[in-house]
Amino acid sequence: MSPLQEIGTAVRMTAIFWIGCGLAYPLIFTGFAQVAFPDQANGSLVRNAQNQVIGSSLIGQKFTSERYFHGRPSSIDYKAEASGASQLAPTNKVLIERVKADAAAFEAQNGTKPTIDLVTTPGSGLDPHITPAGAAVQTARVSRARNLAPEQVRKLVSQYTEGRFLGIFGEPRVNVLALNLALDGIRR
């Protein structure tokens, strides 16, 4: 085979793979996702009554008001474009001091010790869920701030607790955004 033929073969193969992998494959799977899973393919967006996007059920948000359940801390301040962990080792003094400060602030605001998920950052920095126990330790504060019966808030937490995927994978969890939106929907 001459060098010119080899170059021609290389150019054709490059074009075939570029069209196949760069165009056909993404278009086919994007089309499939739009048909089979339209909500997830578009970011699992959460909208308010005016159809405005207020978040995603897959990305955590920072809630600081006493009227809301608080999610996990974020090492990236909930900025999705910077998603990732802090990479601090469990023995790192900066991490230990941050966790101690977060735990003290939580205890001052809630009158009880936090669960571990409420003071440790998730790997992505964007986890939208907390554990049911993490929600339970915040129930008294939220019910007091909203002037609701604690049992009413506990019932709502239970209603928004998601089980394990397929009954065996992962742990039970509570989506903080969904729970807080449900709280806003309560009429007294």
From Swiss-Prot:
It holds the Pfam family KdpC. NCBIfam families: kdpC, PRK00315.1. One of its GO terms (biological process) is potassium ion transmembrane transport. Part of the high-affinity ATP-driven potassium transport (or Kdp) system, which catalyzes the hydrolysis of ATP coupled with the electrogenic transport of potassium into the cytoplasm. This subunit acts as a catalytic chaperone that increases the ATP-binding affinity of the ATP-hydrolyzing subunit KdpB by the formation of a transient KdpB/KdpC/ATP ternary complex. This is Potassium-transporting ATPase KdpC subunit. One of its GO terms (cellular component) is plasma membrane. Belongs to the KdpC family. It is a single-pass membrane protein. It comes from Gloeobacter violaceus (strain ATCC 29082 / PCC 7421). The system is composed of three essential subunits: KdpA, KdpB and KdpC. Its main location: membrane. InterPro entries: KdpC. Keywords: ATP-binding, Cell inner membrane, Cell membrane, Ion transport, Membrane, Nucleotide-binding, Potassium, Potassium transport, Transmembrane, Transmembrane helix, Transport. One of its GO terms (molecular function) is P-type potassium transmembrane transporter activity. The chain crosses the membrane at residues 13-33. It is found in: Cell inner membrane. The keyword Transmembrane applies.
